[in-house]
Structures are given as C-alpha cells and as structure tokens.
Design a protein with these regions (language model features):
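…; additionally, a secondary subgroup of soluble metalloenzymes is captured
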Residues: 5-8, 19, 25, 167-168, ...
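Secreted, luminal/periplasmic, and some membrane-associated catalytic domains
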Residues: 3-138
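Low-complexity, glycine/alanine/valine/leucine- and proline-rich hydrophobic stretches
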Residues: 127-182
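Generic recognition of well-ordered alpha-helical segments
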Residues: 87-94, 162, 179-187
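Glycine-rich loops and low-complexity Gly/Arg-rich segments
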Residues: 37-41, 149-152, 187-188
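Short C-terminal domain-edge/linker segments immediately following a structured domain
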Residues: 1-2, 43-48, 153-162
Length: 188
C-alpha cells in the first residue's frame, strides 16, 4: 500500500475539482463534422490522423478539439458564423449514439463564464453528461469509435468533485471544493 512508506502520524488529503465516471463511448467529432460538410480535407486522412495534417482550412467552416468536452471553432464571419453556430448547436443537441439517445449540452462560452478570455471556442459541447469522449482525430469509417484514439482509457471527468482523507468523517456529501481551505485550517 502506498501509505506504508510514510512517516508515522502523516495525514493524507486528496482533493479533486472533478470526479470520475465510466466512459460510455468515443466520438470522433471532426469525422462527424466532415460527414455533415462543415469540415473539408486536403486529402483522404489515414486512420487516427490528427486534423492538423489534413484539414483544408480555406474550405472548412468548423473544426473541433477533443478532450473531456469538445471545443468547436467556427471558421466564418458575420451572418454565416451565426448560421453555422445555430445549425451545429441544433444537430449536436439531438445527436444520438449507436446505443440510443444521449444527453448533450451545447454552450457558447459566455453562457458559462462571466468573462471569456483568450482564444475561446465558439461552442463547447458536453456529450452524454461527460460520459462520451470527443476526440479530434479523423480517418475512421464511423464517427463512433470502439475506444479512445490515444490508447486504453475507460474513464472520464464527472461534474462532482471528490475528496478523501486519512482522518475525520470522509462520508460528508455536502462539502464544496472551496470548503477544503477551512477544513485544512481546522486540522493543521
């Protein structure tokens, strides 16, 4: 056990602002954007190829980055950008997985953050309450993959954080991540 090597009386606290949950599926989102006509390639991509190597930026109107949620960037301006954003939001909100209906949430960053900084995406998508991992690679027969494009990984973030401690009552469910500072002040 990892704690056995620690000096006697050592206490350990593990805190995460997000929890963990089982991965239900993997979506090659750029593959889907290409099927829908929003993303174009300079040449036919190889299986699992990153989009940077093959995307035709002049003819593409949307491209996505993956992770535990998707970030979609619109390559258009004015009314065209508004229309593309509206259409993607509509399609992604009702997107179904091979196993059936999934809950997807599509946001503009300003809907989630008081202040949007840096090079923010135009849309952010949470697929199936973070149970479906969006990846940015392309070259697949289907946008729905059997597993993660970067190797084995069967879990994803969840919305609720967690904490674990070697002391006290770790069964509390009403604690917030910001409560950790006060908790540490009491025990240190």
């Amino acid at each position: 056990m990892p704690l056995e090597g620690l000096p006697g009386g050592t206490e350990v606290l593990v805190v995460s602002d997000h929890g963990n949950q089982a991965q239900r599926g993997v979506l090659a989102l750029n593959q889907l954007l290409a099927e829908w006509g929003f993303l174009r390639f300079r040449r036919e991509p190889s299986r699992g190829e990153d989009i940077d190597a093959v995307v035709d930026w002049e003819r593409s109107v949307a491209v996505a980055w993956g992770g535990y949620y998707a970030r979609i960037f619109i390559n258009a301006a004015g009314e065209e950008a508004v229309d593309v954003k509206r259409e993607l939001r509509r399609r992604l909100s009702v997107l179904k997985a091979p196993w059936g209906h999934i809950r997807n949430a599509v946001f503009e960053p300003a809907e989630l953050y008081r202040e949007v900084r840096g090079d923010a995406p135009d849309l952010m998508v949470y697929f199936d309450s973070l149970r479906v991992r969006p990846v940015q690679t392309v070259g697949y027969e289907s946008p729905w993959l059997e597993g993660n494009d970067r190797g084995p990984d069967d879990s994803l973030h969840s919305f609720n954080g967690f904490y674990a401690a070697t002391w006290g009552d770790a069964r509390r469910k009403d604690i917030h991540a910001l409560d950790v500072a006060g908790f540490l002040e009491r025990v240190l």
